[in-house]
Amino acid sequence: MTLAEFQADIRAGIPEILPELRPYDHSVSHAPKRKDILTPEEKKLALRNALRYFPKKYHATLAPEFAEELRTYGRIYMYRFRPQYDMYARPIEDYPHKSLQAAGIMLMIQNNLDPAVAQHPHELITYGGNGAVFQNWAQYRLVMKYLSEMTDEQTLVMYSGHPLGLFPSHKNAPRVVVTNGMVIPNYSKPDDWERDNALGVSQYGQMTAGSYMYIGPQGIGHGTTITVLNAARKQMGSNKSQDGIKGMLFVSSGLGGMSGAQPKAGNIAGVVSVVAEINPHAAEKRHAQGWVDELHSDLDELIPAIRKAVAEKRTVSMAYVGNVVDLWERLAAEEIHVDLGSDQTSLHNPWAGGYYPVGMTLEESNDMMAADPDQFRERVQESLRRQVTAINKLTSKGMYFFDYGNAFLLQSQRAGADIVGSDGKFRYPSYVQDIMGPMFFDYGFGPFRWVCTSGAPKDLETTDRIAAEVMEKIRQEAPEEIVGQMDDNIHWIKEAGRNRLVVGSQARILYADAEGRAKIAAAFNDAIKKGEISKPVVLGRDHHDVSGTDSPFRETSNIYDGSQFCADMAIQNVIGDSFRGATWVSIHNGGGVGWGEVINGGFGMLIDGSEDSARHIREMLFWDVNNGIARRSWARNEGSMHAIEREMQRTPGFKVTMPNLVEDDLINNLFN
């Protein structure tokens, strides 16, 4: 397809002439069939909802086709309307546009749906089993058409994948405002998502899937690396040297969109990592992309390979293509010493493809979850109980186990596993409680990211160099409390190119605090203005950040004043970003830990070398981080109190309400 044909297809939106119905493509990974949850009347409603995208003259053709999709897959994806062109992030000038900001958003959307990047690309699922960009291909086509037409005086409003329309606004307003899964709280159970999504009225956007900000496994790679690195240091009782990390064994599960970062992170940290993945498609994709070194499908071969690698203190990553419970039970039976353990199965979505029970094949599980969901639920919970039993045996021998924010502890507790101690608390910490919260989030460090819209590796190399120079300059005057974090982050960005992290767009992830993000972004803007970077850069972050997410079992699990179940921070954050210069903003229900368990939001900002971009950087990035530090400070988190005091000294006009600490004895004596 020529560039002109591609641009014409984008501008056309939903085509005037129905495209040919193509055969089901078995070359890519597909979402499992969803449970049959709709009543007969609701199925009729789902069809009416789907057909309203199309002229009446096509209803007789499309109605039986969509009804068959609903019967076969549990959803209406509108496969007929999947574009003929290849899906990937093109250079920004390839997109037909009147607004350069809108062209940047088109690039980001296509990256989220790139088969090299997305988990189930034909079902518009980017990661996590159900993290959707859109609900169907009609929505995709309409959105791309609107983006190609809009000006910088309009805003596109997105309701859970559905483009409500272009509304008049102004150049400093966001070009797109996204909401995903915003349901009334009393109707936010997992089955409510199943029903609403099958009806075509809501979707689960995960975090960066529905907000057009996913950058492949690299997006979680830096966070996973510093988590593994600092978990290893906790085991060693030292944070001064990496020598003792060599030969440590790290065991986990998942090679999907987020979990797929684990083996690469293990390599960067210098450990032996073993990650189980039941889906051969996912394991082979990560191996082909260089994110895992070895594939093993036989435990009798894997166990000796693990022993040998540990004895030789090699840095190597191994994937076990099989069920994680089989792996944990075998490690426990063989009494292999595991240093670090975690889990990244998609337990935010345990009954619909996020967790596969032991003793069943992938295909058997996919069939049962749709045909007999109650029995499947029992098998999942039995499997979780067995997994926890094996993990408990290994932790009794010295393994440090941490929950990686995927609802493992929560779902294990609900399954009746031996996961709660005598004090009523979980046996194991969340990684945010032990590592990410007190060491990073409380000081404002989080997953800042950028995408070079030229698509040129040379531009990415330039941004890496600029970011390293900025960080090194900040490091010279950094307070002692954050020197270790700065050193790890500088090392990451200097090694990023060599570690071959790019999958999809020319993107980079870098943990940085408010000062670092603003100064790096300002330096990028200057470099674009001077022509050192050839095209605009999109700035963003994961929602998994200092201010973006209220999640009591992950991002805010180290909030102990009782407000961990409140979502004021995430809501205030997206509102504040929207009028301080974000190009697009999003707010979601459920990213990471699951539907009804989380509120999370994010942003994207296209910078083009202009003074407007410089102002947006100054105003928005400051708020986007310090909102969360202020909230964490009010919760009496020591690191945040230090960080916010420092920020108030640095920034005129910034004044935060500080907590007054109370003596424990004073309170305790009143209740004796």
Question: Across the structure, where does each feature detected by a protein language model lie?
Answer:
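Long, compositionally biased, glycine/small-hydrophobic-enriched stretches that function as flexible linkers
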Residues: 1-198, 202-213, 373-523, 527-540, ...
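Residue-level detector of anion-binding/catalytic polar loops
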Residues: 272, 337, 400
